C-alpha cells in the first residue's frame, strides 16, 4: 500500500491554512513549505504538529517542486493553502492507494470554487480539473510566472471527489489578484514577443463574458455568476491593456 504525502506551500495564510491541513490529516505525512510568512501561519502549522520547512519564495513552480522533493513518500497530494479535500475525495484517494502501487501515474481532480457565498458550478471555473495526486517519480510541476501544473509520464486517471477552493476573501481581494496576475502575464508575454493588436483585448473580453455568462451557465448562478463572468472578462481585457502599455515603453 503506497503511503501518501500531502504537500502544501504557504505564505501569510493564517485565515485558511488550518482548514486545509485538517482536510489532509488522513494522509501518512503532511508537509508545509512556508515562503516567509509574517503572520501566524507558521505558528498554526507547528501547533497542528505538521512538518514545516522554511524556504524563501522564488516562484510557484520552483517552490512546489522543492516541496514535493522534500516529501517522505513518493505518492504526493499537492494542495494549496486556500483548498480543502472533500470527504468523497478523501475516500477515493484512500481507495486508489489501497493496492500495492498507485494504479495510474497521476489523477486529475475536479476543483469547485466557493465565491460570494455559493458554489460556482459553471463559467470557466468549473470543472477546473487539476492533476494533484501523482507519483513524484513520474511527474513534477512545470509552467511560468502565472500558471503552473503537474506534468507526468504515464497514464492519468480521474477522480470524482472535489477539491474545495476558496481563493478570494472578497471582491476587493479578487480585484487585487487580477491586477497582480495580469501584470505577470503581460510581462511574460512581452518578453516572448507577443503583440497587443488594436481592439483585440476588448473583443476577447466581450467574448469571454458571453462564454462565461451565457454559454457556461453563469446566468444560472445569480449575482455571483454575473460577478464571476465580469471578473473573468476584466482579467482578459487587463492582460492586453498592460501588454499594450509595455509595448509603448520600447
Region spans (language model):
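Cell-envelope/extracellular polymer assembly enzymes that use nucleotide-activated donors
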Residues: 3-5
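Short, well-formed alpha-helical segments that are part of the catalytic scaffolds
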Residues: 7-26
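Catalytic-site signature of metal-activated, phosphate-bearing donor transferases
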Residues: 68, 74-75, 79, 86-250
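Acidic helix N-cap motif at the loop->helix transition within catalytic regions
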Residues: 15-18, 39-48, 88-89
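Glycine-rich, basic loop-to-helix element that forms the pyrophosphate-binding segment
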Residues: 56-71
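Conserved beta-strand segments of alpha/beta enzyme cores
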Residues: 29, 51, 155-157
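A conserved acidic beta->alpha catalytic loop
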Residues: 23, 34-44, 80
Amino acid at each position: 500500500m503506497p503511503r501518501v504525502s500531502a504537500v502544501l506551500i504557504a505564505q501569510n495564510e493564517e485565515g485558511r491554512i488550518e482548514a486545509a491541513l485538517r482536510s489532509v490529516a488522513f494522509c501518512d505525512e503532511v508537509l508545509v513549505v512556508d515562503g516567509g510568512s509574517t503572520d501566524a501561519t507558521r505558528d498554526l502549522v507547528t501547533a497542528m504538529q505538521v512538518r514545516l520547512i522554511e524556504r524563501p519564495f522564488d516562484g510557484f513552480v520552483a517552490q512546489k517542486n522543492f516541496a514535493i522533493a522534500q516529501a517522505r513518500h513518493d505518492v504526493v497530494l499537492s494542495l494549496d493553502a486556500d483548498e480543502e479535500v472533500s470527504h468523497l475525495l478523501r475516500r477515493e484517494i484512500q481507495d486508489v492507494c489501497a493496492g500495492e502501487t498507485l494504479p495510474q501515474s497521476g489523477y486529475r481532480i475536479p476543483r469547485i470554487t466557493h465565491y460570494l457565498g455559493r458554489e460556482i458550478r459553471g463559467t470557466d471555473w468549473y470543472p477546473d480539473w487539476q492533476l494533484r495526486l501523482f507519483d513524484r517519480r513520474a511527474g513534477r510541476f512545470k509552467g511560468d510566472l502565472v500558471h503552473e501544473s503537474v506534468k507526468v509520464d504515464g497514464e492519468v486517471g480521474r477522480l470524482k471527489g472535489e477539491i474545495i477552493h476558496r481563493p478570494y476573501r472578497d471582491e476587493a481581494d479578487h480585484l487585487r489578484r487580477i491586477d497582480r496576475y495580469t501584470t505577470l502575464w503581460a510581462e511574460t508575454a512581452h518578453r516572448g514577443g507577443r503583440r497587443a493588436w488594436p481592439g483585440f483585448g476588448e473583443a476577447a473580453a466581450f467574448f469571454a463574458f458571453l462564454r462565461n455568462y451565457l454559454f457556461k451557465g453563469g446566468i444560472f448562478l445569480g449575482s455571483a455568476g454575473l460577478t464571476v463572468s465580469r471578473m473573468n472578462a476584466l482579467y482578459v481585457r487587463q492582460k492586453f491593456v498592460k501588454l499594450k502599455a509595455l509595448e509603448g515603453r520600447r
